Amino acid sequence: MMYVLDTNVVSELRKIQVGKADSNVAAWTQSVDASELFVSAITIMELELGVLSIERKDITQGTLLRIWMEQHVLPEFSERTLPVDTVVALRCAQLHVPDRCDERDALIAATALVHGMAVVTRNVADFQPTGVTILNPWEWRIHTCSE
């Protein structure tokens, strides 16, 4: 199985090195090969927005997050960042009819659906209406939209 990591999962992965990550998330991460883990360009955007926001408020923490982003996230996912292309955009549009959902989440879900992947997230409720397969590593079980 291949996975698209939501922003909250990538953020949690940062905590593993310092022993502050949720134990279920850390265990799940150890159970999968890194080559199976992807991010959407939307996740990269959300992470960058977060770093920029913190840099404006707290220089020290912002610097640490900037280093994490530039030395870990971007290099680690350089070959595993999925773009929002025409096919993903069209699939995202379909997810908005008849129930409008958050566009960022819909783009991540559409990316996973187009590529036949599961979304890994803590925000299960945000993705359930899309029909994408969801894995919550905090609970480490797969949810489907029929649950």
List the model feature ranges, each with a label:
Residues 1, 27-30, 72-73, 81, ...:
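Short secondary-structure boundary/capping segments
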Residues 49-54, 63, 75-120, 147:
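Active-site neighborhoods of divalent-metal-dependent phosphate/nucleic-acid chemistry enzymes
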